[in-house]
Amino acid sequence: IRSAIVYAYESRLVDVTVLEELFIEVYNLFEGGTPGVAELREPLYYFVSDYCDRMLPWRVRETLDPSLDFGKSIIMDSDLNDLRYLYRFGEYISETELATARFMNELPEETVRRMADTYTEGYRKGFAATGRSYEGKKTVQIRYHIGFERMIRMAVENFRELGLEPIIARASIGTVNRMAARTNGYYGTPANRQYEYDHRYDNAVYLDKAFRERKLSILKVAYETYKDLASVYAGPAVVETFGEAGFEPVNAAAAFSLSEKQEKLLLSYSNEAMQIVDAYIPGTETSFTIIAFPLPEIGAEFEAIFKETIRINTLDYELYRDIQQIMINELDQASQVHISGRGGNRTDLTVQLHTLAEPTKQSNFENCVADVNIPVGEVFTSPQLAGTNGLLHVGSVYIGEFQFKDLEIRFENGIAVSYTCKNFETEEENKALVKQMILKNHETLPMGEFAIGTNTTAYEVALRYGILDKFPILIAEKMGPHFAVGDTCYSWMEDCPVFNPDGREMVARENEISAKRKENPQEAYFGCHTDITIPYSELDTIEAIHPDGTSVKIIAGGRFALPGTEKLN
C-alpha cells in the first residue's frame, strides 16, 4: 500500500487505483468482525498474482529505458541550491539527505568534478581491464543515495561524453519487485530500519509454486519485450554510502517468515531469474563500477572524513599494482594459504589454491586496482574447495547494515558446515540471522573468494577517526583478508579470459561447484556473494605454503612482511 506514495508522485493513476481497490477489499473484510488469516490472505494473494504482469514488466522497463526520466529530470533540471527539490523524488527525506545535499553544494567545483571523474573513469577502466568494449552499448544505470545530486549531474554529463545515456530509476518498491537491501536505484534513508527488517519476508503471504512459475513466465516475456533495450545496456555504476548508526535488529513475533518450502522456492526463482537476465544481458558483455562516500551521520568529523575518503578513492593505483604483483608472484608459488587470528580472534583457516599448468603464463590471483571496485587494494582468487578447511572468526563485522558479533563459520572442503554469532540470546536465533543475512537462506554455501586487502591507508584513516565499524564492505574488504560465501567473483563469466597487468591470465575463475554450469546451471550458482573481512587488528599471520611444505609469510603480526611490500605498513 505504501507504494501508492510513489505512484502518486509519478502520476501512475492506474497503479494507485488498484491499490486503493485492494485496501477497500481488505477493509470490507473487517466490517463483519475480525477475519481469519486464510480469509485475509486470499485478496492479497490474488492481487499480487493478478497484477504481477503489470508490476514486474514496469520494473524491467524502468531499469533499461532512459526515456523514463522522472528522477533524472529532477537531477538535471532542478536548482540544486534550493533543497526543496529533494522532496520531488517521492522518497522519505531525512536530515541526512538534507545535510548531504547542503554539504555537496558547499564543496568547490573542482572537488565535485574530481569525485564524478573518478567514478565515471572507474567505469570506463572496468571495460578496458577486462578486455571488453562498450562500443555498441548506449545506456548505463546510475544507483545512488539521494543527496549527491551535484556529483550525479556531472556524472551524467561524463557518461554522455562516453556515448552512454544514464538510466536513473528509483530503488524497487512493492512486494513483487522489492529487494531485501533497497539500494538498486536511487533511495533515501529508511524512516524506520526495524520496520524494514520486520517486513523483509512479507512475500510469505503469497509465495507458492504457482506464483513462482507465473513470475518467471512474466519475467521472460518482459525481457523479450524489451530485448532491444537490454542489448544496449552496459551495466550499473553505483555510489554507495556509509556512516549510518549501527543497527541491531529485534525479531518480532508478528513478522512474517518463510517456510522451508518457501525458502527453496525463492532460491530456485532467483537462480532461474538470473539465467533469464543473463540470456538478454550477458555478463560477458557488461561491466560496472562501485565507489563509496560518507554520510553526515558518521559524526562531527564528517567533513574531514569526506576529504579523506576522496583521498582514499584516488590513491596511486600504479604503486599498489606493483606491490600487489610482488605478493601475487609469491602466492603463485604456493599450493595453500594459511590464515590465523590473534588476541581474541580464533581464525585458523587453510585455503587451497588451484594448480597452475603454466606458471609463466597463468596466475591464481587477480591484481585488483581502482576500476570496477574503487578504491584500490586487493588481490583475490576463487579457492579450490577440496582442501579448504578451518574456522573463520570475526569479533565484530558489519555485513550490509547489520553488525555481527563473534561471527563464526567453519569450513570443510570449502563448504560452510556450521555457523553462528552472538547477536541474540538463543543459538537458534543466532544461526537464523547468519543464514538469512549471510547465507541468503541457503542451508550452506561454498567459499567463493579469498582475498588479501592492501589498503592500509584506509585502515589508518579508520583507526584515526574511530570508524573501523563504519566503512562499507567496498572499502573494508581492502583492509585485511576477506572471504566470500556464495558464488565466485566470476559467476556467469568463468569462460571470459581475465589478464593481470603483467600479461598473465588469472585462471582461478571457477571452483568445483561453478564447474557444473555447462551441464546444470541450477546447481552451479547460488545468486549471492557475501564478503566477510578480518581487520588487521584481529589478524596475526597470512603465509603462503609451498608444495614442499616450506612457507613464506605475507603478513606477520598484522603487518606486511614479504620483502617489497613494506611500504604498505
Where are these regions (language model features)?
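Short, glycine-/Ser/Thr-/acidic-enriched flexible segments
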Residues: G147, E244-G246, L295, G344, ...
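Short solvent-exposed loop/turn micro-motifs enriched in small/polar/acidic residues
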Residues: D332, G400-Q403, E443, A476
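Active-site bordering "gate/hinge" segments
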Residues: I1-A386, I555, R559-N569
